[in-house]
């Protein structure tokens, strides 16, 4: 639970993302779920060129159809791109989250400081939160890319069926609490875990 009216407003997607990065205070892993072409990884590197960052993606496109509202519909396989190249401090993990996250967890213990969830789908967000639940601790910052339709457009009219829904279920299932941190003009928002 949390009061979204108290979130810091940042107008642009890039400025919003970089503002969220500056709010991370916890020591722990920094992660991105849904790297795709790596735009937000590049934004991270602008601010923190030496930060170790763990990025996950199938690089095969969406694992299932995604209906986000109005006539905007993506099919399984849409959004596939080649895996980008980054400096060695950016660790990339190829595969579906259901396979790559358990493998990653077996070698990476301890708290997660930051997760950028840009995996679009309810199922992908749910997998992320459930798989990483024991490493998401008070102080972990969660940033979402398609979270709420702040613009009230038809393009993301189905927002409540995806990242929002997965987060609400995770909060209830695990008796967690969050505090809003930021939002932008479109769909992005972030929060910090407090319980």
Could you say what each language-model-derived stretch is?
Residues 22-195:
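S-adenosylmethionine/decaboxylated-SAM
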């Amino acid at each position: 639970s949390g009061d979204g009216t108290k979130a810091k407003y940042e107008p642009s997607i890039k400025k919003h993302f970089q503002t969220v990065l500056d709010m991370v205070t916890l020591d722990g892993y920094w992660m991105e779920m849904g790297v795709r072409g790596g735009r937000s990884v590049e934004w991270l590197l602008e601010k923190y060129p030496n930060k170790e960052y763990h990025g996950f993606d199938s690089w095969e496109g969406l694992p299932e159809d995604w209906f986000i509202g109005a006539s905007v519909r993506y099919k399984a396989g849409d959004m596939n791109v080649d895996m980008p190249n980054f400096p060695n401090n950016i660790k990339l993990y190829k595969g579906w989250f259901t396979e790559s996250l358990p493998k990653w967890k077996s070698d990476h213990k301890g708290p997660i400081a930051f997760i950028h969830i840009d995996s679009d789908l309810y199922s992908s967000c749910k997998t992320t939160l459930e798989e990483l639940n024991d490493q998401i601790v008070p102080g972990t910052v969660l940033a979402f890319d398609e979270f709420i339709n702040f613009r009230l457009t038809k393009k993301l009219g189905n927002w409540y069926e995806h990242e929002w829904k997965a987060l609400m279920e995770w909060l209830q299932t695990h008796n967690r609490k969050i505090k809003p941190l930021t939002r932008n003009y479109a769909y992005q928002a972030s929060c910090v875990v407090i319980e």
